[in-house]
């Protein structure tokens, strides 16, 4: 399998941590993708240009960190990425949603501060801090 990432993507970091926890580093090649550049060769691999993106052993491409985490856990027989049943399920899902929202804001903030200073939106930066 091959996982395409960018260095600063919190979503890619999440999957890299899971790969470590599952002890499958030797089964997943991690490749830095060049995103947000015109004519990047990465667009031939994933037309949306988003990361993380996993190419499975059968050639299927998976986009979305939750989907990739669920897939890896299913393939390697782990319950690390499953919600508990019963009364705890909705609280776990609620906390998962809060964490996803935090990661969304972090992604926007990181992308904004990476821009040249004359192109940054101070409003966006202030909102996401």
Sequence positions of predicted segments:
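GST-like domain detector, emphasizing the conserved glutathione-binding G-site
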Residues: 1-121
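Amphipathic alpha-helical packing segments from all-alpha helical-bundle domains
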Residues: 123-129
């Amino acid at each position: 399998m091959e996982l395409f990432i960018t260095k600063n993507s919190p979503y890619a970091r999440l999957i890299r941590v899971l790969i470590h926890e599952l002890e499958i580093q030797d089964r997943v090649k991690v490749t830095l993708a060049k995103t947000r550049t015109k004519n990047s060769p990465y667009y031939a691999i994933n037309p949306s240009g988003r990361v993380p993106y996993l190419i499975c052993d059968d050639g299927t491409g998976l986009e979305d960190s939750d989907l990739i985490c669920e897939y890896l856990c299913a393939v390697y027989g782990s319950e690390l990425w499953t919600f508990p049943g019963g009364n705890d399920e909705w609280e776990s899902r609620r906390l998962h949603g809060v964490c996803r929202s935090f990661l969304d804001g972090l992604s926007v903030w990181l992308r904004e501060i990476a821009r040249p200073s004359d192109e940054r939106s101070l409003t966006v930066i202030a909102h996401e801090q």
